[in-house]
């Protein structure tokens, strides 16, 4: 006999956009089975916590979230990257109902079913064709693969999520098409290593509409560019074939934006990280990219205070940044990660040195960012609207990804809508953001 009311699930999603997509997939299945989402733990039938386990600080955040769920509800299912090594969770919270690792969707659903059976059997017409999304309606993350074949010395992602497993290109494109049909204006392409897409399946073809499409970075990006939405490429490893997509950007098929986590510039540090070390060639490539696509925006992340990083190495990084002129930069102070080979490296860096170098790096980047944004004053930029304010509206240019990059603050004579793409005249710039007025629709 069916239960009278729909079971309610409270959901916490921590970590990176890849984990957010995992959460969306779990929630889509739960909604298809008649479960409802609760806004608060208190009063929900269950709480699911999708954890992050990449850094110690992320593990502490995950444990705190589990603790809050246990205190306010008591019925907690844990999944995600930290769940791949459950001992710490079990020691802190032995009463959790279930612990699973990342991408183990069926195990999570089984745990939910055991604790609170579904209201009815799943019928996919109970959820929208594009599935349930945790992002605003006008943009969505599109995950094209799982896992990673690289073995960076500071990273345990392959241990947590396994080796590269690429989705068929046809499946990715069908998901993207549904998202665009549902009103998504911006597709953020993500994976652990986006530019390695298809390597594991030898670029196998799969059917898409009336043709076959290869599971290859360039081919997929080109097809996504035909769907009529902004296409933004994230987590791109700097392989030589990345050069090929710059033409798509110059032609306006995908956004002139590349998110490439270089991590450092010193060849010695990069070798210790087990990352590509030819940074002089990288500077040449960046120069060629910008010659081919002058509007190209580069985002990157860097680690300071890596074991063995000398003052000379750090100065090399600062000088490299001056030449590369990275538009958007995220910086992290090195943290040991349990199970990472870098833990065994000699010459660990003191915390106060890490902090001092981080401060200097961010100050240098602030000046670079301000200089590059100032060049946009007087230009016209397309802006996608994210938030409507009483007097000023917040949006993003093609050079800005949501949450991690800068913003464009606009005044407009007529009301604007979230998700609308407008043309803005840029009036002024500060260190990280642009300010302007709407000049066209």
From Swiss-Prot:
<dbReference type="InterPro" id="IPR020612">
    <property type="entry name" value="Methylthiotransferase_CS"/>
</dbReference>
<feature type="domain" description="TRAM">
    <location>
        <begin position="374"/>
        <end position="440"/>
    </location>
</feature>
<feature type="binding site">
    <location>
        <position position="152"/>
    </location>
    <ligand>
        <name>[4Fe-4S] cluster 2</name>
    </ligand>
</feature>
<keyword id="KW-0949">S-adenosyl-L-methionine</keyword>
<dbReference type="InterPro" id="IPR002792">
    <property type="entry name" value="TRAM_dom"/>
</dbReference>
<dbReference type="GO" id="GO:0046872">
    <property type="term" value="F:metal ion binding"/>
</dbReference>
<dbReference type="InterPro" id="IPR023404">
    <property type="entry name" value="rSAM_horseshoe"/>
</dbReference>
<dbReference type="Pfam" id="PF18693">
    <property type="entry name" value="TRAM_2"/>
</dbReference>
<dbReference type="InterPro" id="IPR006638">
    <property type="entry name" value="Elp3/MiaA/NifB-like_rSAM"/>
</dbReference>
<dbReference type="InterPro" id="IPR007197">
    <property type="entry name" value="rSAM"/>
</dbReference>
<feature type="binding site">
    <location>
        <position position="155"/>
    </location>
    <ligand>
        <name>[4Fe-4S] cluster 2</name>
    </ligand>
</feature>
<feature type="domain" description="Radical SAM core">
    <location>
        <begin position="134"/>
        <end position="371"/>
    </location>
</feature>
<keyword id="KW-0408">Iron</keyword>
<keyword id="KW-0808">Transferase</keyword>
<dbReference type="GO" id="GO:0051539">
    <property type="term" value="F:4 iron, 4 sulfur cluster binding"/>
</dbReference>
<feature type="binding site">
    <location>
        <position position="52"/>
    </location>
    <ligand>
        <name>[4Fe-4S] cluster 1</name>
    </ligand>
</feature>
<dbReference type="InterPro" id="IPR012340">
    <property type="entry name" value="NA-bd_OB-fold"/>
</dbReference>
<keyword id="KW-0963">Cytoplasm</keyword>
<dbReference type="GO" id="GO:0103039">
    <property type="term" value="F:protein methylthiotransferase activity"/>
</dbReference>
<dbReference type="GO" id="GO:0006400">
    <property type="term" value="P:tRNA modification"/>
</dbReference>
<keyword id="KW-0004">4Fe-4S</keyword>
<feature type="domain" description="MTTase N-terminal">
    <location>
        <begin position="7"/>
        <end position="117"/>
    </location>
</feature>
<dbReference type="GO" id="GO:0005829">
    <property type="term" value="C:cytosol"/>
</dbReference>
<dbReference type="Pfam" id="PF04055">
    <property type="entry name" value="Radical_SAM"/>
</dbReference>
<dbReference type="InterPro" id="IPR038135">
    <property type="entry name" value="Methylthiotransferase_N_sf"/>
</dbReference>
<dbReference type="Pfam" id="PF00919">
    <property type="entry name" value="UPF0004"/>
</dbReference>
<comment type="function">
    <text>Catalyzes the methylthiolation of an aspartic acid residue of ribosomal protein uS12.</text>
</comment>
<keyword id="KW-0479">Metal-binding</keyword>
<feature type="binding site">
    <location>
        <position position="81"/>
    </location>
    <ligand>
        <name>[4Fe-4S] cluster 1</name>
    </ligand>
</feature>
<dbReference type="InterPro" id="IPR005840">
    <property type="entry name" value="Ribosomal_uS12_MeSTrfase_RimO"/>
</dbReference>
<protein>
    <recommendedName>
        <fullName>Ribosomal protein uS12 methylthiotransferase RimO</fullName>
        <ecNumber>2.8.4.4</ecNumber>
    </recommendedName>
</protein>
<comment type="similarity">
    <text>Belongs to the methylthiotransferase family. RimO subfamily.</text>
</comment>
<feature type="binding site">
    <location>
        <position position="16"/>
    </location>
    <ligand>
        <name>[4Fe-4S] cluster 1</name>
    </ligand>
</feature>
<dbReference type="InterPro" id="IPR013848">
    <property type="entry name" value="Methylthiotransferase_N"/>
</dbReference>
<dbReference type="GO" id="GO:0035599">
    <property type="term" value="F:aspartic acid methylthiotransferase activity"/>
</dbReference>
<dbReference type="InterPro" id="IPR005839">
    <property type="entry name" value="Methylthiotransferase"/>
</dbReference>
<feature type="binding site">
    <location>
        <position position="148"/>
    </location>
    <ligand>
        <name>[4Fe-4S] cluster 2</name>
    </ligand>
</feature>
<keyword id="KW-0411">Iron-sulfur</keyword>
């Amino acid at each position: 006999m069916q239960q009278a009311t729909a079971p309610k699930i409270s959901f916490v999603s921590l970590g990176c956009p890849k984990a957010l997509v995992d959460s969306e997939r779990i929630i889509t299945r739960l909604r298809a089975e008649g479960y409802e989402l609760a806004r608060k733990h208190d009063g929900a039938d269950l709480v699911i916590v999708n954890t992050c386990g990449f850094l110690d600080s992320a593990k502490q955040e995950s444990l705190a979230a589990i603790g809050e769920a246990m205190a306010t509800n008591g019925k907690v299912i844990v999944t995600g990257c930290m769940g791949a090594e459950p001992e710490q969770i079990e020691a802190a919270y032995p009463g959790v109902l279930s612990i699973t690792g990342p991408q183990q969707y069926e195990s999570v659903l089984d745990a939910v079913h055991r604790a609170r059976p579904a209201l009815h059997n799943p019928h996919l017409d109970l959820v929208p064709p594009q599935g349930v999304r945790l992002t605003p309606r006008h943009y969505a993350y599109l995950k094209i693969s799982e896992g990673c074949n690289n073995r960076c010395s500071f990273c345990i992602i392959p241990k947590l999520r396994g080796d590269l497993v690429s989705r068929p290109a046809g499946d990715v494109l069908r998901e993207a098409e549904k998202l665009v049909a549902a009103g998504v204006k911006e597709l953020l392409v993500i994976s652990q290593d986006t530019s390695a897409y298809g390597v594991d399946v030898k670029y196998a073809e799969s059917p898409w509409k009336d043709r076959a499409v290869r599971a290859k970075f360039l081919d997929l990006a080109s097809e996504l560019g035909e769907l009529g939405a902004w296409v933004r490429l994230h987590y791109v490893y700097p392989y030589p074939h990345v050069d090929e997509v710059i033409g798509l950007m110059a032609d306006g098929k995908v956004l002139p934006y590349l998110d490439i986590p270089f991590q450092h510039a010193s060849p010695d540090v990069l070798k210790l990280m087990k990352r590509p070390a030819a940074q002089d060639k990288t500077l040449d490539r960046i120069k060629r990219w910008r010659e081919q696509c002058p509007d190209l925006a580069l985002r990157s992340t860097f680690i300071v205070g890596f074991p063995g990083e000398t003052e000379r190495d750090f100065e090399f990084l600062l000088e490299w940044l001056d030449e590369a002129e990275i538009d958007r930069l995220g910086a992290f102070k090195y943290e040991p990660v349990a199970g990472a080979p870098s833990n065994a490296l000699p010459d660990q860096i003191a915390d106060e040195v890490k902090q001092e170098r981080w401060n200097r790096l961010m100050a240098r980047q602030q000046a670079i960012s301000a200089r590059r944004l100032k060049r946009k004053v007087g230009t016209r930029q397309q802006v996608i609207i994210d938030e409507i304010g009483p007097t000023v509206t917040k949006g993003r240019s093609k050079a800005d990804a949501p949450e991690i990059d800068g913003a464009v603050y606009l005044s407009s004579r007529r009301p604007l809508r979230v998700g609308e793409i407008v043309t803005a005249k840029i009036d002024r710039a500060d260190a990280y953001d642009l300010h302007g007025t709407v000049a066209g629709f």
